[in-house]
């Protein structure tokens, strides 16, 4: 499990334990379904997002299930609590024209501009997570054959094709990049250190403004756009799932809903009875 996920689950349990302590409960077996329901209700009152509350309940379920299996707890209480209803939120997606404007925003006459353009091109070409992008090593990319090897969530390795535009952008960047023998990462800051997720997030926000893109944009939006545009042009859902590194095709199916939404808008705009 990823470190960020572990930290989130730990934080969920600490928060619930603090609530139980305030209620005078001395151990986990004193917790009843109503305790959990009241806690989740209080979290809503604190304006916690529905997705956050749902994750907190999942954390409790995992904890109790493990405790019961290990004989440390008597009852699996959280399984009696109904999950919050999550609204289906479609991913933010750029149009192909917006992607073109975004990828053209970096200044190709500067080293940082060449780096940023290569990162943007690669992100859109492969649908990588930004955490995977910044960790890429030079040995992970085969520019001659046009593919890369990436280690994603759960230490699962996958092979992803890389298009000619992204390959050329990477070549242009590497031709001007100052060599830092100690660094194997592809994308380095001007100080010779690996680019960070936050650093790149700030850069993409800057380029979105320069490209006059009004949507709320993040590196993940390019991942969403990669998947949606593939499906819109007829790509097989299972192939897209493999390239994204999704363990279940159900996760990938959300992009078909985006496609249907796009079709509905097109029909409404252009059909005489739309």
Question: Language-model segments: which ranges?
Answer:
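Conserved catalytic core of the tyrosine transesterase superfamily
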Residues: 1-274
């Amino acid at each position: 499990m990823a470190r960020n996920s572990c930290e989130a689950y730990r934080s969920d349990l600490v928060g619930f334990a603090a609530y139980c302590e305030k209620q005078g409960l001395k151990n986990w077996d004193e917790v009843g379904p109503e305790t959990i329901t009241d806690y989740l209700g209080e979290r809503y009152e604190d304006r916690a997002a529905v997705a956050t509350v749902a994750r907190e309940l999942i954390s409790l379920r995992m904890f109790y299930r493990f405790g019961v299996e290990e004989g440390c707890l008597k009852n699996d209480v959280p399984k009696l609590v109904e999950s919050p209803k999550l609204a289906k939120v479609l991913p933010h997606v750029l149009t192909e024209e917006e992607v073109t404007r975004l990828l053209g925003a970096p200044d190709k006459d500067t080293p940082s501009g060449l780096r940023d353009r290569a990162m943007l091109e690669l992100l859109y070409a492969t649908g990588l997570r930004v955490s995977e992008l910044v960790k890429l090593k030079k040995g992970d990319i085969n520019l001659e054959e046009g593919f890369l090897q990436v280690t994603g969530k759960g230490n699962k390795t996958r092979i992803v094709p890389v298009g000619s535009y992204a390959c050329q952008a990477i070549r242009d960047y590497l031709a001007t990049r100052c060599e830092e023998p100690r660094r194997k990462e592809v994308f380095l800051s001007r100080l010779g250190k690996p680019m960070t997720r936050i650093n790149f997030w700030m850069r993409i926000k800057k380029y979105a403004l320069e490209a006059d893109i009004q949507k709320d944009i993040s590196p993940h939006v390019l991942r969403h756009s990669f998947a949606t545009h593939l499906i819109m042009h007829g790509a097989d859902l299972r192939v897209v799932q493999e390239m994204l590194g999704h363990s279940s095709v159900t996760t990938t199916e959300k992009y078909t809903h985006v496609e249907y939404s796009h079709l509905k808008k097109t029909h409404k705009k252009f059909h005489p009875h739309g």
